[in-house]
Amino acid sequence: EAQYHNFSDLELIPVATGDEIDIGGRTLKFISAQMLHWPDSMFTFLAEDGILFSNDAFGQHVCQSKRFDSDYSVDYLLKEAQKYYANLVTLGSPMLRMKLQELTDNGILEQIKMIAPCHGQIWTNPGPVVEKYSEWASGVCKDKITVIYDTMHHSTEKLAYQIAEGIMSEGVEVEMYFMQEDGPDDAITDILDSKAIAIGAPTMMNKPFPRIGNMVYWLDCVNFKGTGSEKNALIFSSKGWGGGAVAKLQRDLEEAGFTVTDTMDVLFVPDEEVLAEAFEKGAALAR
């Protein structure tokens, strides 16, 4: 029931999945899409023209002077769609899988000629983004690992670079994020289709450095578990005495659905032997 006071004098017709409205030569068909990504989200299909008004699904956080996907690079738009999905839709992945199946079962999916989301470009060729949504919602990953780190006096940074080198030595793609320069939203975008992460932070007051603590908070919020993806994690850290960052990160990452396969907890500045160990741990994560 609508609670907002301005609705009180309006004539409202509630609609749900399966309802249709004839608007004069055109038929609107409704499909409830709760939590994609609002509780009241709904798809509306304009049957005669094959247009799916998808609300938030299939959107991108871009605002361009032109309206259609054909005006821009498909690779650019799919990357923006991935960023939107990773940060806003991942939590609703089980619902999205259900809705894609529902659109298939009722014959609407094969009739879609255009998708008009609330945000970003209109898809005149919806095939690529529908395919990507199916992959993202099902936890399909590339042979890719995302490395995320912060550093205080460059010790953790040295570990990060050696781990990345080890990963690449196995022919696996690496995306690297330094949290003093990069945002968590960009890192989460790449984590969506990564098979694993390596995450590092120096210890500060027996806890991870704050930006990495914030990063792990967001990983728990978006909930990659919902995609069915089983992502491994390598944790690395430097410390001055007692440590504590690794233990905290391990607890929080496991709660967020990651499988922690290995850790490094280094005292002060890593020497050549420790850096060689970091390289091997990166290679092992890639394998």
Regions found by a protein language model. Give the residues of each.
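Short beta-strand/turn micro-motifs composed of small residues
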Residues: 149-151, 237
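Terminal amphipathic helices with adjacent charged low-complexity linkers/tails
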Residues: 119-145
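FMN-binding flavodoxin-like domain, especially the glycine-rich phosphate-binding loop
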Residues: 56, 64-68, 74-115, 119-122, ...
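Conserved hydrophobic helix-helix packing surfaces used for dimerization/oligomerization
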Residues: 28, 51, 145-147, 233
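Glycine-rich phosphate/diphosphate-binding loop of Rossmann-like nucleotide-binding domains
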Residues: 156
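Short, glycine/acidic-enriched loop or turn micro-motifs at the edges of active sites
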Residues: 59, 122, 153
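Anionic-ligand anchoring segments at beta-strand to alpha-helix junctions in alpha/beta enzyme folds, i.e.
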Residues: 1-2
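Catalytic core of the metallo-beta-lactamase
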Residues: 5-71
